[in-house]
Amino acid sequence: MSTRANTLQENSATEFSSIGPDVWQGKENPLFIESDNLCAAWKTHALENDHLSVRIGRWNIPGEPIVILVDFQPFFEKKNDIYTEMWNRFQVDSLHAYGDYDEASMFSYAAGRVVESFYRYNLTETDKVVYQAHEWMTGMGALYVQEAVPEVATIFTTHATSSDVR
C-alpha cells in the first residue's frame, strides 16, 4: 500500500480509504495516526448500533490515506454461524480449512460489516462505491458486501501465479 496510496490519491477524483485489522489494540502503532475527528459520529454509531469497534485515522505513509482499523476478535465467537451463512449463500466450504483461514476470514467478514455500516450511515445509493478485496484472505468480505450492500460494487484481485505453463 505504501507504494500505491499516494498515486491513487493524486490521480483520483474520489476518496480512497482502506480497512485493516486492529492487531495493535491498545499499543502504539507507528504506521497509524489516529484521529478523534474523522467520522466521529459514525464511529459511535458503529459501536452502539452495529457492535463494531473501530479506530479511524491515517496510515503514516506517503499520501497519508484514511484507514479504518476494525477489531475482528468478537466475530470468532460467531465463527460457526458465519461459516454456515457463507456455505448457505455462496457454497464456501470452511470445514476443511487450516492455517490462517479463520483469522483471515473473521477479519474479512468484519471488514464487510464495516463497509455495510459506513455505507448505510454516511452514503446513499447514488454514491459510487467500490470495495476491492485483495487475495483470498479478503474474499469473504467481498461476498458479504455483495449480499448485504448490493449498491456497492465489488472487485476481487488475486496475484496468484502458476508455474504450470502448457
Question: What does each model-found stretch correspond to?
Answer:
Residues M1-R166:
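Catalytic cores of nucleotide-sugar-dependent glycosyltransferases that transfer UDP/GDP/TDP-activated
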